[in-house]
Design a protein with these regions (language model features):
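Electropositive, gly/pro-rich neighborhoods at or near active sites that engage anionic ligands
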Residues: 41-219
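Anaerobic metallocofactor- and corrinoid-dependent redox/one-carbon enzyme cores
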Residues: 2-53, 57, 96, 104-106, ...
Length: 527
């Protein structure tokens, strides 16, 4: 299952080899610039003993926008830029006033973006100029490190936003995100220092991922193994796609007294693994006609679509007008749901064509029995200790990979007896392959690797991980795995809007990341 690809914020628009809307690119450049400055002043005030939790939370929300997932509504985006600039000036003014009062020599950042005349043409032009300045002032390697940092911040912010849906406790990871981002304010930061910052942040990033899993299980119940229907039932319907379970829950609460059927889409299928969602009679199952085309799924669904927070696909114009979103900014043709007022969405569902008959496609399993899984993992650990296993291979953090199954067929055929595979994508009954025929997020694989690490010295025992799907969180997964002690990481062939060829080359050279070849035998030999 592909969990969503994002439009990477990189230099392709400046270099002219990818199709990002140049106006949106320029606006994003201004957003990035203003966010760097507001983060700088926020941290300075924090160092002086002033804390503004609401502002910190808003900055984290803004940071979730720094990589484009779809074409934003420009008017809303302009309004957001204006709001961020106003907040930046306010915290800058407070910092300057404090410095003057205490007669301190405080560093004020130079601002290249002028907001005196706030109109689209002026801001776009300044964004273009800022992109040129940024690209000309940084070396290729430092630009790649900036790109990695932005990817990690985006991924971490998304997860932190969802995490904050379940707790009001202080989360030190928020400060970790802002401190990493603040490093981008200093052009003198060397490559070696940035690499260290990235590696240090891996622990924070992993803790966010781990905490989110724990809090969701506390709130929705422990993940279990469940059967889920793929298809539709007769009636009016709403399709929900994205990543934020709290948004799905809020919708289900809003429609619980109606006859509207609700279906999950794409990676949101994991909601069915949590017991709390079973109580909602309106949640009928999962709708997905294509494993690789959101466009097709949305156009064939006979009802409105709710794009919940952190949905990351580029959207076609064909179904604009019946798309709704809980995101901070709506995409073109979308209606934004504000303050959990789902009435416009419910009205759209009531007025939609709906499905005139039941249509069942399949039954699939979602989730896992953790106790049973760990019993099997303990047996693997014993085999490792007894030296029956010489190399452990993990194939797929997510299920149903985009990589061609023929590659894995050959890998399975040529797997030696002293190699063991834990996989979510190779349906095999071989004694040295543990296959999970179920949909779930990456939390299970992380749990397995973390458990193995407690009993096996990963500095001495070889473990290789094949990431089989490229998406918004791929960069995050790379450094989570490295934090867990996995040094042999293989990537599939990612599209350039996820990982550019230049970035892949950089990851290979600086972090020893590998890419699968077209020869599984060779890859096995080189493990």
């Amino acid at each position: 299952m592909d969990y969503g690809e994002n439009m990477s914020y990189n230099d392709c628009a400046v270099d002219g080899y990818c199709s990002i809307d140049p106006i949106m690119y320029s606006l994003m450049e201004v957003l990035l610039y203003e966010l760097k400055q507001i983060t700088y002043y926020y941290i300075k005030m924090q160092e002086l003993g002033y804390e503004n939790k609401a502002l910190k939370s808003r900055i984290i929300n803004y940071l979730s926008l720094i990589l484009i997932g779809y074409e934003f509504n420009r008017e809303e985006f302009q309004a957001l830029l204006k709001e961020i600039h106003k907040e930046k000036e306010s915290v800058k003014e407070a910092y300057t006033a404090f410095c003057d009062e205490k007669n301190m020599d405080c560093q004020i950042l130079k601002s290249n973006i002028k907001f005196e005349k706030f109109d689209l043409s002026s801001i776009v032009n300044q964004g273009e100029q800022q992109a040129i300045r940024r690209n000309s002032s940084l070396s290729a390697d430092v630009k790649n490190l900036y790109e990695i940092i932005l990817n990690l911040i985006k991924s971490a912010s998304i997860r932190l936003i969802e995490l904050k849906c379940y707790t009001e406790d202080y989360l030190p990871e928020e400060d970790g995100i802002l401190k990493l981002f603040n490093n981008l304010n200093f052009s003198a930061m060397t490559e070696s220092k940035l690499i260290k910052k990235v590696n240090d942040f891996a622990q924070i990033n992993y803790q966010i991922h781990k905490k989110l899993h724990v809090f969701k299980e506390e709130y929705y119940g422990a993940i279990g193994l469940h059967d889920v229907s793929i298809g539709v039932e007769k009636g009016k319907s709403i399709l929900v796609s994205g990543q934020n379970l709290k948004d799905l829950e809020n919708l289900l609460e809003a429609v619980k007294d109606t006859d509207i059927n609700v279906y999950t889409h794409n990676g949101l299928i994991v909601a069915h693994a949590y017991p709390k969602f079973a109580k909602y009679k309106n949640l009928k199952g999962h709708f997905q006609m294509s494993m690789d085309s959101v466009q097709y799924d949305f156009t064939t669904f006979k009802g409105p679509v709710l794009v919940i927070r952190n949905f990351q696909y580029l959207l076609d114009k064909l179904y604009r007008g019946r798309l709704f979103t809980t995101n901070l900014i709506a995409g073109k043709g979308m209606t934004r749901i504000e303050k959990n007022n789902f009435k416009p969405l419910v009205d759209a569902a009531e007025n939609s064509q709906g499905f005139d008959r039941d249509h069942s496609i399949a039954q699939v399993k979602v989730g896992y029995d953790e106790e049973l899984v760990m019993q099997k993992v303990d047996k693997i650990i014993e085999k490792i200790k007894n030296k029956d296993i010489k190399h452990l291979i993990v194939v797929g953090l997510l299920n149903h990979a985009a990589m061609h199954s023929q590659y894995f067929d050959v890998l399975e055929e040529n797997l030696s007896d002293d190699h063991y595979v834990i996989t979510t994508v190779i349906p095999s009954k071989k004694d040295n392959i543990l296959y999970f025929d179920s949909f779930f997020n990456s939390s299970l694989i992380y749990k397995i690797l973390s458990h193995i690490k407690k009993h096996v010295d990963l500095d001495k025992f070889p473990v290789s991980v094949f990431i089989t799907t490229c998406n918004l969180h791929t960069m995050s997964h790379i450094f989570n795995l490295k934090y867990l002690g996995i040094n042999s990481i293989y990537l599939p062939e990612c599209t350039s809007n996820i990982i550019t060829p230049n970035m892949l080359k950089f990851l290979k050279e600086k972090f020893d990341i590998k890419q699968v070849s077209d020869d599984p035998k060779k890859d096995l030999k080189n493990l």
